[in-house]
């Protein structure tokens, strides 16, 4: 190397060293350890100098260090599960400062308090309402529907395993009588790839349930009630929540949720999950003998399901701004979900399919806007809008039929149920606008309007080119409401409200006896409903509630148009009308480390044109579901809820519900002849059921920030008739028997819930379980789950 080159290299090296030395003289360093109050190191805690970009994270030993220019700063320490701490520091040029800190474990407590306050707010309202805290279940493999079953008056009915058809029963009202919302946005038309029984419980902060009488803010035509899934809204700088579970029947479930809120208010969040299961559990079922064509219903065989694979995937993305002068929340969202579902049985278990299946997807862009104190103090507005495109393809092209042994027999014509390769294209628009105005401390006025529009077109893919139905199926509805709430003091509050219902329907209606000639038919209807609710916080921890609503429910898309497969629609269905009454008395008290809560409720429903799902016999021994109006249905019921907790280590409670839902029409539908089922129970409705749970908590197992939780829970359903009890022969054969399911869950949370392991055994007595006649659910099953959470 030449002398010149050596000189240049030496000069560059000397310059770098000199500059570094000068920089070091102008900077200082602060280091130390971040500990819990118990003296344990807190890893991955965030440490930063306020108002600067100088930051770091602690290592596994809780150590940190930051280099920054000399000066006075405020240093901030934060970590999930702990209270944020701020301290003044001074960095001096060329000096090292040492600062050890201890953080209080109150961030997790604050989160619990936040959720608890929201739960209490719902429970203390004038409406017959309760809230389920899903945060207690995040380490389990439960779905939102399974969490919902913990609410009083609720019964979840599924036809099988993961991804099976599901119906919610609330106070004797089931299916479409109960409306589902997510953050106050109606979920009609969302599609089967995004339903309560395939959304993980981690997706929600809590589930609110309003029974019978529904606040104007939902804009719902729900005579049964409303379920509102509330997603987390606490502002977190960043977070990652991920889990994976594996269990019986080759069941895989995974979930990931991550997001960030920047200092300028920009926010993004991604939520994704998937479910997969072979659903190949054992059932006891009559089997058709292809040699004789006979089905021996007295001698069921122990057989395994073989055409019941299900999987779905979903991604929910949101981005926008929060806490800005012009918006508290302005978020743009996009949901994508898809599903594949093999269909093992029809509406009865003895009907078995071997190749029938369906698949589909759903796309949904959305807009969410909210602003408190808009233009003037006390004026709050919110707007939610979305568009959903949902495509479902039904495939039934097999040339053979199957029995439960997996044997095949050739069909005279293709199609196990009905020969089809068809696509249903659903388009759904929804918008909800709410204005609240608080006048002083005692008065609140609310105006709400919810609009929903739907159309469906069908393509027959068996033709070349594919052909579309001559007539599209179209509905639109608008529900507008206004309410006034008066709160004279902290002990009393009252609400009165009115709702205007409008619906337009257009679609094909059969005009021939053979159901092969159709004409385009349309209709438009308008109704007005009203109601009131009040509550009184009595002495000694008692609370009394009373509410009433003249409610209407408009026929849904599926009830009028079917599902193009196993459900048959009826455009002539009339809206349901009901007088709904709720009375509730609750008691809440704390005695030292003991907390007691008890609530008893009475409900009454006088319903006209009640829409009931029945089974329709088709040719060839096949069946489908259809919907009919009953003239009058009378419902009376009671529910009791109780919960007790002691200190930090024990919590137990449960719910009991008994409903008396009777056919109250003296004459047969459409005639003057006596109604043979008059005063009989409505068929195919569970009328007595209960659940309970016991939770033990062992805090400090392994280290003080760890907790072991052992949970036992059960569900009981009393037997009920599939048909009206006094009509027909051999009705004892059509009874869903008594059932008692027992489950056990053990979970271990490490470092204030950062790492979590859980193990579940469901139905550990291996009982035969049925939610619907003859459709047997899974026996004993085992599941394991791992979950991690990072953030602050």
Spans of features found by a protein language model:
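Short, acidic, small-residue-rich periplasmic hinge/interaction motif at the N-terminus
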Residues: 35-37, 46-50, 78-82, 92, ...
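Membrane-embedded beta-barrel scaffold of Gram-negative outer-membrane proteins
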Residues: 537, 544-549, 553, 576-636
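Short acidic/polar hinge/loop motifs at secondary-structure boundaries
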Residues: 65-67, 185-212
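N-terminal periplasmic accessory domains that precede
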Residues: 97-102, 144-147, 164-169, 181, ...
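Periplasmic-side early beta-strands and strand-to-turn transitions of outer-membrane beta-barrels
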Residues: 236, 245, 262-348
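Gram-negative outer-membrane beta-barrel transporters
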Residues: 597-606, 628-721
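Face-selective signature of the C-terminal outer-membrane beta-barrel domain
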Residues: 316-339, 358-515, 519-531, 535-539, ...
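Extracytoplasmic beta-strand/coil segments of soluble accessory domains associated
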Residues: 145-186
């Amino acid at each position: 190397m030449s002398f010149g080159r050596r000189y240049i290299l030496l000069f560059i090296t000397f310059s770098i060293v000199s500059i570094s030395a000068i920089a070091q003289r102008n900077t200082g360093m602060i280091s130390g350890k971040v500990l819990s109050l118990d003296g344990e190191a807190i890893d991955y805690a965030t440490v930063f100098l306020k108002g600067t970009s100088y930051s770091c994270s602690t290592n596994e030993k809780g150590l940190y260090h930051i280099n920054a220019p000399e000066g006075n700063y405020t240093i901030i320490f934060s970590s999930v599960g702990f209270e944020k701490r701020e301290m003044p520091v001074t960095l001096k040029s060329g000096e090292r400062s040492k600062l050890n800190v201890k953080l209080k474990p109150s961030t997790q407590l604050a989160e619990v308090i936040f959720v608890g306050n929201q739960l209490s707010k719902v429970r203390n309202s004038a409406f017959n309402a309760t809230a389920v805290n899903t945060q207690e279940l995040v380490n389990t493999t439960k779905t939102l529907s399974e969490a919902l079953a913990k609410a009083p008056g609720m019964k979840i009915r599924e036809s099988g395993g993961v991804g099976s058809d599901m119906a919610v029963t609330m106070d004797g009202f089931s299916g479409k009588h109960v409306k589902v919302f997510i953050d106050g946005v109606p979920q009609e038309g969302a599609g089967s790839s995004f339903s309560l029984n395939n959304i993980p419980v981690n997706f929600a902060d809590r589930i609110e349930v309003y029974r019978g009488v529904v606040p104007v803010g939902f804009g719902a035509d729900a005579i049964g009630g409303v379920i509102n899934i509330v997603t987390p809204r606490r502002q977190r700088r960043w977070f990652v929540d991920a889990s994976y579970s594996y269990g019986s029947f080759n069941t895989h479930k995974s979930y990931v949720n991550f997001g960030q809120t920047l200092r300028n208010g920009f926010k993004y969040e991604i939520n994704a999950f998937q479910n997969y299961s072979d659903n190949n559990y054992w059932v006891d079922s009559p089997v058709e003998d292809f040699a004789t064509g006979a089905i021996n219903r007295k001698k069921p065989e122990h057989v395994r399901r073989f055409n019941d694979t299900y999987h779905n995937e979903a991604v929910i993305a949101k981005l926008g701004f929060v806490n800005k002068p012009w918006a508290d929340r302005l978020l743009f969202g996009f949901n994508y979900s898809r599903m594949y579902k093999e269909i093992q049985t029809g509406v009865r278990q003895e009907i078995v399919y071997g190749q029938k299946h369906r698949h589909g997807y759903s796309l949904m862009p959305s807009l969410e806007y909210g602003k408190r104190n808009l233009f003037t103090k006390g004026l709050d507005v919110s707007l939610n809008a979305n568009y959903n495109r949902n495509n479902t393809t039904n495939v039934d092209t097999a040339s053979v039929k199957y029995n439960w042994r997996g044997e095949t027999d050739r069909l005279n014509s293709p199609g196990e149920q009905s020969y089809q390769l068809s696509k249903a294209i659903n388009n759904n628009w929804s918008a909800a606008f709410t204005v609240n105005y608080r006048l002083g401390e005692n008065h609140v006025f609310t105006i709400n309007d919810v609009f929903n529009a739907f159309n469906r077109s069908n393509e027959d893919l068996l033709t070349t080119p594919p052909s579309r139905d001559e007539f599209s199926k179209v509905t639109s509805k608008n529900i507008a409401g206004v309410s006034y709430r008066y709160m004279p003091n902290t002990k009393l509050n009252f609400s009165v409200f009115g709702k205007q219902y409008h619906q337009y329907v257009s679609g094909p209606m059969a005009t021939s006896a053979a159901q092969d000639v159709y004409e385009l038919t349309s209709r438009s209807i308008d109704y007005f409903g009203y109601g009131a609710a009040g509550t009184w916080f009595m002495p000694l921890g008692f609370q009394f509630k009373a509410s009433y609503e003249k409610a209407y429910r408009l026929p849904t898309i599926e009830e009028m148009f079917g599902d193009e497969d196993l459900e048959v629609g009826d455009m002539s269905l009339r809206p349901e009308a009901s007088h709904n009454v709720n009375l509730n008395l609750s008691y809440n008290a704390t005695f030292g480390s003991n907390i007691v809560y008890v609530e008893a409720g009475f409900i009454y429903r006088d319903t006209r044109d009640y829409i009931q799902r029945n089974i329709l016999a088709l040719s060839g021994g096949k069946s489908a579901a259809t919907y009919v109006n009953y003239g009058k249905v009378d419902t009376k019921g009671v529910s009791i809820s109780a919960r007790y907790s002691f200190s930090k280590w024990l919590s137990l409670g449960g719910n009991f519900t008994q409903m008396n839902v009777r056919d109250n029409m003296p004459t047969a539908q459409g005639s003057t002849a006596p109604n043979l089922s008059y005063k009989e129970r409505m068929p195919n409705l569970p009328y007595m059921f209960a659940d309970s749970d016991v939770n033990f908590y062992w805090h400090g197992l392994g280290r003080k920030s760890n907790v072991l939780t052992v949970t036992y829970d059960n569900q009981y359903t009393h037997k009920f008739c599939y048909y009206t009890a006094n009509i027909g022969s051999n009705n004892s054969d059509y009874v869903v028997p008594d059932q008692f399911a027992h489950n056990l869950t053990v979970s271990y949370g490490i470092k204030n819930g950062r790492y979590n392991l859980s193990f579940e055994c469901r139905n550990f007595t291996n009982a035969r379980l049925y939610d619907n006649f003859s459709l047997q659910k899974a026996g004993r099953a085992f599941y394991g789950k791992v979950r991690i959470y990072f953030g602050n």
